[in-house]
Amino acid sequence: MQPYLDLMRHVHEHGTDKADRTGTGTRSVFGHQMRFDLQQGFPLVTTKKVHIKSIVYELLWFLQGATNVRWLRENGVTIWDEWADAEGELGPIYGYQWRSWPTPSGEHIDQIAELIAQIKRNPDSRRLIVSAWNVADIPRMKLPPCHAFFQFYVADGKLSCQLYQRSADIFLGVPFNIASYALLTHMIAQQTGLDVGDFVWTGGDCHLYNNHFEQVETQLARTPLPLPKLHIKRKPDSIFDYRYEDFEIVGYESHPAIKAPVAV
């Protein structure tokens, strides 16, 4: 995960100090790209312990098309609690847009199902895209999509994915986002009979919150460990039938966790 640490160091040392929506203050750069060869290991940060359970359950929750945190809480995942209302609702966020993008005629588009069908039918398409950035629905979202748009690419029997993340909380959010989309790429590759290729992460506003600087310096002083491997124990009938128990991260060794406050 050296590319991730390089981004963190670059922003910490050369970023521009700016105000932000949360009132916390950030140091940021605009525009950065990282590439991870998924054949070489699963891109999970090792310079601090990452909560794998939250990553897996959140992705399964997105794939359900869910927008209420109840199911996450039932499974011990609280990463969305700060944004949910009293009933646990978040509005038409990621899962809704992925699975039920509304059309002017009142119908809904299942972007994930259509994506997989397109990969199988026309793998050379340049339209293998899923978007969560629905401008009409943003006012009703508790938090507009940070990881907003992703595209797949098939070459030499391998499936690659590129994510565009408009807003990137480097210390807390980005390790989750990298692992989540790497996991999704593995799942879709399995469903479409392909091997995995690269995961490409592209960031817009890449920032460190001012109250994370001490934690950043601690993390940058640590030496990365070898990447783990992902093992998917079975192939379900569809992308929507995976369970938490289907995934095993093999050989994950990390430095201790580093706690930091979330900017809401």
Curated annotation (Swiss-Prot):
The Gene Ontology biological process annotation of the record reads: dTMP biosynthetic process; dTTP biosynthetic process; methylation
Write out the entry's keywords from A to Z: Cytoplasm, Methyltransferase, Nucleotide biosynthesis, Transferase
Q: Which domain of life is it from?
A: Bacteria
Annotated metabolic or biological route of this protein? Pyrimidine metabolism; dTTP biosynthesis
Q: Which PROSITE patterns match?
A: THYMIDYLATE_SYNTHASE (PS00091)
Please list the residues that make up the active site: 146
Give the E.C. number(s): 2.1.1.45
Reactions catalysed according to its record: dUMP + (6R)-5,10-methylene-5,6,7,8-tetrahydrofolate = 7,8-dihydrofolate + dTMP
Q: Which InterPro entries match?
A: Thymidate_synth/dCMP_Mease (IPR045097), Thymidate_synth/dCMP_Mease_dom (IPR023451), Thymidate_synth/dCMP_Mease_sf (IPR036926), Thymidylate_synthase (IPR000398), Thymidylate_synthase_AS (IPR020940)
Q: Where in the cell is it found?
A: Cytoplasm
What are the GO MF terms of this UniProt record?
A: thymidylate synthase activity
Gene3D superfamilies, sorted: Thymidylate synthase/dCMP hydroxymethylase domain (3.30.572.10)
| Binding annotation for (6R)-5,10-methylene-5,6,7,8-tetrahydrofolate | 51, 169, 263
Give the UniProt entry's GO cellular component terms: cytosol
Which residues are listed for dUMP binding in this entry?
Answer: 21, 126-127, 166-169, 177, 207-209
Top EC class, one word: transferase
Q: Which family does the similarity line name?
A: Belongs to the thymidylate synthase family. Bacterial-type ThyA subfamily.
Assembly and interaction partners? Homodimer.
Described purpose of this protein according to its UniProt entry: Catalyzes the reductive methylation of 2'-deoxyuridine-5'-monophosphate (dUMP) to 2'-deoxythymidine-5'-monophosphate (dTMP) while utilizing 5,10-methylenetetrahydrofolate (mTHF) as the methyl donor and reductant in the reaction, yielding dihydrofolate (DHF) as a by-product. This enzymatic reaction provides an intracellular de novo source of dTMP, an essential precursor for DNA biosynthesis.
Supply the name of the protein.
Thymidylate synthase
